[in-house]
Amino acid sequence: MATALYLASLRDLPDPAVDDSLLPLVSPARQEKIARLRLPAARRRALGAGLLLRRVLSDAGEELPPIAFGPQGKPYFPDRPDLQFSLSHSADAVLCALSDSSVGCDVEILGPARPELAERFFHPSERRWLSALPPSEYDEAFFRLWTLKESYLKATGLGLSGGLESFCVDLGGGVPRLWETPDAERWWLFSVLDGSCVCGLCHSGETSPILRRVDLLP
């Protein structure tokens, strides 16, 4: 199957603690997670992620299987090794990727970059490349790098324990590429800016997905 990448807004979702009409559409485990969350924004994010995962699976002709978590917190379907997924959210945006091979995704809202984070977490080659950019290009480039690096660590299952600075993403040639990691040739990177949402994807497929923006409400 081709890798699917879906983006949705959480803006119109109700707080499930006030309006629980959408809760039956997500898994019992996610309902329990939502019930444990104290902040309305966190409950809406958890609900939105569950709804988007259900939508992506439905469009692929699949039902929601049970979900388990790996040692570093990566979610997976233990009964469906042929289906891999990844979820991410930022502010009022939620992103979901579904594939038949290893996949990771990340979304961030485009805004002022934080150079101190680049100094702390980016590879030296990435920092040099960023510092040479015109100021007008810096913010978008920063978030493209950040989302692609997060996506790679999610796809590998390493999470942040893998170290954002331990490998390099090269954006200089137009097509994102991985460097300084032994499995670089296995992975394909995809980056897209949709409105204010910077979306990154790392997967072991060989085709770039088309980002679909969808509504979460029935």
For each feature predicted by the language model, list its residue ranges:
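Core catalytic alpha/beta fold that binds nucleotide/phospho-ligands
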Residues: 1-218
